[in-house]
Amino acid sequence: MEKAYNISELRFENDYLILTADNQTIKLRLKDISKKLAKANEQELNDFKISPSGYGIHWRLLDEDLSVNGLLKLYQTKSPKNQLHI
């Protein structure tokens, strides 16, 4: 199976999700991504699984699924004040 994305990092810092996919790192506010993620505690946030294809991320405790493609598109549409490219 060909990987959609090569995800090398997914972590949380304050109220942000930081994702490195295909050597591109993006930082998005949790409240801009998902209400469930924005309200989650540290344990809930860190209990995630990246799909084998690298296409999606699943949070078991939150019953939340997000696509990496969707996160990258959201990053591209956010205004410069709401995003940070690392």
What are these regions (language model features)?
Residues 1-86:
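Motif-centric detector for short Cys/His coordination patterns
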